[in-house]
Amino acid sequence: MGEIKGYISQVIGPVVDIHFDYGTEETVTLPRIHDAMEISRPNGKILIVEVQQHIGENTVRTVAMDTTDGLRRGMEAVSYGMPITMPTGDQVKGRLMNVTGDPIDGMAQLTKDGALPIHREPPKFEDLTTTQEVLYTGIKVIDLLEPYAKGGKIGLFGGAGVGKTVLIMELINNIAKKNNGFSVFAGVGERTREGNDLLREMIQSGVIRYGEEFKKSMEAGNWDLSKIDYDELAKSQATLVFGQMNEPPGARSSVALSGLTIAESFRDKASEGERKDILFFIDNIFRFTQAGSEVSALLGRMPSAVGYQPTLATEMGAMQERITSTKKGSITSVQAVYVPADDLTDPAPATTFTHLDATTVLSRKITELGIYPAVDPLESTSRILDPLIVGKEHYDTAQRVKQILQRNKELQDIISILGMEELSDEDRLTVNRARRVQRFLSQPFSVAEQFTGVPGVMVSIEDTIRGFKMIMDGETDDIPEQAFLNVGTIEDVLEKAKQLKEQAN
C-alpha cells in the first residue's frame, strides 16, 4: 500500500479523526487498522497516530502517541501503509527509546533498517518448544522455592519500597553474567524518576556500558554525553523502552508491545545451533490494562466489569501469547503487578494471573526482619516446582523448607503469648531450624554492593539444596543465627560463624 493523504477533521483530547477525499472513481482508500499516520506539527516535529477504527466510508479514528497540543482541523496526515515499527539489531543495545522507537537518551537517531512492526502474530505452534527448562537465576529463594521456567511468565507482587526494582536489577545482572543473556525493560506508565534511577543503576552495575570516562563523570555529579564510549555501548546487555506516566494512553497501552518487539527480534535472530534466552521486564502490567481501559473509553466502547474495557482478555492474551519459547530461544518475562485496593478478584490482576507460570511475592513483614530479598516463601508459587522437571531431591528439599516455615508460622502466636519455654522440645527445635532457614534465604546482591559494602554472590542450585538440607538435618544447630544472614553458600555460613567466634573472644 502506497502513500495515502488525509486531513484532520476532529480532535478530542488524544483522539484524532482523519478524513479522506473520494478519488476520481468515487472510491476512497483508507489505511488499515493499526497503521501509523504522521502529522507534521507547525514546529516541524512529527506526531505519530495509530488507526483504531473506520468510521463511515471515508473517516478513520486514530489515537495519538504523544500530546495533541497545537493540532487543528485541516492539517495534513499521511499514511505510508505501515504500522508503528521498532528499530532492531545491535544499535539498540544500551539505548533508551519511546513507544515509536525514537531515542530519548539524547544520543544519535536509530536507523529503521530491519525495523519490526509492534503488532505481530504470536509464533506458530510448529515453532514452539515443548521442553520444560528451568532458568536458574543464582538467587537461592527463587531457584529453590519458585523456580522460573525459560519462556515463562512471572508475576512480581509487592508494595512500595520492598525491593522490586533491586530484585529486577539483580535478575538482569545475573542473567547477563551467568547466561550472557540480554534484557529488555518496558516501563509502562513509569514515573520518570524511576526510569532515571534504573538507567543510573544499570550504568553503575555495568549492564549498560557508557564507558569508564562517563562513569567517573557521573559519579562526580555530571551527565556529559560527549564522554560516552560507543564501542563499549555496543556491548551493553539491556535496552530500555519507556511510556511515561505523563504520556497519552495510546503510548502507555502500546509501549509493552514496543519492548516485546525488541525482545522478539533478539530471540529470533539467534544463529544456527545457538539459543538466545531473553529477559523481558514490564513495570507495571496493571498500567498496561489501565491505559487500554482509557483508550477503550475514548473510542466510545461500552465499559465492562468495574469499568474496564470489554476487550481486556483479548488485549492481554494478544501480548502474553507472544512471550514464549521457540526453537531459536526463549523470552522469559517478569511482570510487576499492582493489585488495586489489595483485591485479587479485580479484573485487571485476575486476567493477568491466568497467564502466569510463577509468582514472587515480596513482603513488608520480611523487610522488617532485615531479610533481603524480601520474598515470602509461603505465598510465592511456581508451576514447574515438580519432581519430573526440577528433580526429586530439589522438590523434596523445597517441600521440607515450606513445611518447616509453615510450622514456625503456626507456632508464632504461642511464642508471642507464652514464650519459647512453653514449647515442646520438638517444636523448639523446629523454630530454631526455621529461623536459620529463614535467614539463609537472604543473600547479598551485586547491585546493592555499593550500599551494603558486601560483595554480591550467585549460588548454584546444587549448593542451595545442600545448604538447606544440612540446616534441616540438624548439622548446623550449634551455629549462631546471625551467621546465616546475608551470605551465599553454607561454607560462607561456617566462615562467618568462625569470624563471629573470633570477634567474641
From Swiss-Prot:
It comes from the Bacteria. This is ATP synthase subunit beta. Keywords: ATP synthesis, ATP-binding, Cell inner membrane, Cell membrane, CF(1), Hydrogen ion transport, Ion transport, Membrane, Nucleotide-binding, Translocase, Transport. Gene3D superfamilies: 2.40.10.170, Bovine Mitochondrial F1-atpase, Atp Synthase Beta Chain, Chain D, domain 3, P-loop containing nucleotide triphosphate hydrolases. It catalyses: ATP + H2O + 4 H(+)(in) = ADP + phosphate + 5 H(+)(out). It is found in: Cell inner membrane. Its EC number is 7.1.2.2. Belongs to the ATPase alpha/beta chains family. It is a peripheral membrane protein. Produces ATP from ADP in the presence of a proton gradient across the membrane. The catalytic sites are hosted primarily by the beta subunits. Pfam families: ATP-synt_ab, ATP-synt_ab_N, ATP-synt_VA_C. CDD domains: ATP-synt_F1_beta_C (cd18110), ATP-synt_F1_beta_N (cd18115), F1-ATPase_beta_CD (cd01133). One of its GO terms (molecular function) is ATP binding. GO terms for cellular component: plasma membrane; proton-transporting ATP synthase complex. F-type ATPases have 2 components, CF(1) - the catalytic core - and CF(0) - the membrane proton channel. CF(1) has five subunits: alpha(3), beta(3), gamma(1), delta(1), epsilon(1). CF(0) has three main subunits: a(1), b(2) and c(9-12). The alpha and beta chains form an alternating ring which encloses part of the gamma chain. CF(1) is attached to CF(0) by a central stalk formed by the gamma and epsilon chains, while a peripheral stalk is formed by the delta and b chains. Its main location: membrane. It comes from Parabacteroides distasonis (strain ATCC 8503 / DSM 20701 / CIP 104284 / JCM 5825 / NCTC 11152). ATP binds at G158, G159, A160, G161, V162, G163, K164, T165.
